[in-house]
A protein has these predicted regions:
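Noncatalytic, solvent-exposed loop/strand surfaces
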Residues: 1-290
Length: 290
């Protein structure tokens, strides 16, 4: 892919070691002076687009590191899996199969009533897993067919979005969900899903949740802001006049939300339920990273 490389994944560190994931080239651990501690060959991880396997986009999911455990989400053409490794030795602790095509999201670690969970995005297989064993806790089908954004947790809800193909959903999932929580046709909520929106999902950007609002920006620059608890739409506004794509995820701090377009324009908005631009800054170069 023209926007990809052989090093799409972000490094993970716990202050003692660096974990790097290079898809088919393997999983690596280094100390902070660059000494190789261990490496794992995970085989061929074919992350080509499922409708055109010859389109080699490379893997994009980043490793996560928690409590001396490294977790990898490897959704590929054949044999998709989620796996955990001992960060000190590289020993595989568990591996579970996933019924999904290539996806590019990174898992999130979350504590629910004393249980550590892994939450993953997907198309056919969005879900949560027990961090210690890999046992599935809940699952959900019905994402966009090229999932990229990372799940975000806020105030008892897990926000998952994706966009591409016929669906572009936003889900607010209760952290206590169990079992199959896939929505029935025409439904927007159930016992596991607090609320959802069918067509406002983000393609590339992970949405921040800030001061009770969810900020979801589409690839074409349309920003949708939701009440995190109720799903009420506060406003929708197009940024960049529709002339630039958005790949970089928004960030929020100090009462402001920062959104960077691919053409290098950074939009600074006042955080809140109404649209107000505080500043625009030109980086004079393309911006795709967060």
């Amino acid at each position: 892919h023209t926007k990809a490389s052989h090093a799409n994944s972000t490094l993970a560190t716990d202050g003692e070691r660096l974990i790097a994931f290079f898809g088919s080239e393997g999983l690596y651990a280094y100390d902070l002076k660059g000494k190789l501690l261990w490496q794992k060959d995970l085989g061929v991880l074919d992350a080509g687009w499922f409708t055109d396997p010859s389109a080699q986009w490379e893997t994009g999911s980043s490793p996560i590191l928690h409590d001396n455990v490294v977790v990898i989400q490897a959704d590929v053409q054949k044999g998709s899996f989620l796996a955990a490794f001992d960060a000190r030795t590289g020993k595989e602790l568990w591996r579970v199969s996933r019924s999904d095509v290539p996806t590019w999201g990174t898992p999130t670690v979350h504590q629910v009533n004393g249980q550590t969970q892994l939450v993953v995005n997907g198309w056919r297989h969005i879900g949560a897993y027990d961090f210690k064993t890999g046992k599935e806790i809940w699952k959900l089908t019905g994402g966009g067919d090229i999932p990229v954004p990372t799940p975000v947790v806020h105030d008892g809800l897990i926000f998952i979005t994706s966009a591409h193909g016929p669906k572009a959903p936003v889900y607010a999932i209760r952290e206590t969900a169990t079992g199959d929580i896939t929505l029935a046709d025409g439904a927007t909520s159930n016992a596991g899903v607090a609320w959802s929106a069918a067509r406002d999902g983000g393609y590339m950007c992970t949405p921040p949740v800030y001061r009770g609002l969810v900020y979801i920006v589409k690839y074409n620059g349309v920003l949708s802001v939701y009440d995190a608890k109720t799903g009420e739409v506060k406003f929708q506004q197009r940024l960049a006049g529709g002339t630039s794509a958005f790949t970089s995820s928004p960030i929020a701090a100090d009462g402001k939300v920062f959104l960077a377009s691919e053409d290098g324009r950074v939009y600074v908005l006042k955080a809140g339920p109404t649209f107000e631009v505080l500043a625009e800054n030109d980086m004079t170069e393309s911006v795709l990273s967060t």
